[in-house]
């Protein structure tokens, strides 16, 4: 996401290649290949796009030289996509979703750091068999281990973060 000067709002603007290019040192961990599956706001995600994403990820994970798949995703529906992938992926190889709390127009954009952490997770043998994982804010954990926050009086916590579902990144 970057701030569109006309709309004055974040819009999908970064390809997987753009994101990988922002990370120095990735090549010392893995050879990275990018496939831009879509570039839409994450609130456009739903069953038809999840099915297409699952098919692409399963196809990539079937290749013996692929160690894992990283999916760059907006935060609006990140948890729904992660859950979907957790129950539909047919591999014990890591599938790591990354998001960002800051968009690419901000000087402290956290997407590159999250990507580097996801690459490290994909090449770590201990990551096999953990299902869909999330790498964000210098933390990583399997989706099944994510804590459910307790909301006071069961009130929703509203959020105004915009996101996108850009690409999956194969780690070979």
Give residue spans per PLM region.
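Active-site histidine-anchored catalytic micro-motif
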Residues: 1-172
């Amino acid at each position: 996401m970057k701030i569109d000067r006309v709309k004055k709002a974040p819009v999908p603007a970064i390809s997987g290649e753009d994101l990988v290019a922002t990370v120095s040192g990735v090549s010392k961990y893995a050879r990275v290949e990018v496939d831009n599956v879509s570039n839409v706001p994450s609130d456009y995600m739903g069953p038809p796009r999840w099915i297409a994403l699952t098919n692409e990820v399963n196809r990539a994970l079937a290749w013996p030289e692929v160690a894992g798949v990283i999916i760059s995703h907006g935060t609006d529906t990140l948890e729904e996509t992660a859950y979907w992938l957790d129950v539909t992926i047919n591999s014990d190889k890591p599938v790591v979703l990354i998001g960002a709390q800051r968009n690419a127009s901000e000087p402290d954009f956290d997407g590159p750091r999250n990507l580097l952490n996801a690459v490290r997770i994909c090449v770590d043998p201990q990551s096999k068999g953990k299902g869909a994982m999330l790498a964000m804010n210098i933390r990583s954990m399997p989706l099944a281990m994510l804590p459910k926050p307790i909301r006071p009086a069961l009130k929703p916590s509203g959020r105004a973060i915009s996101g996108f579902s850009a690409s999956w990144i194969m780690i070979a």
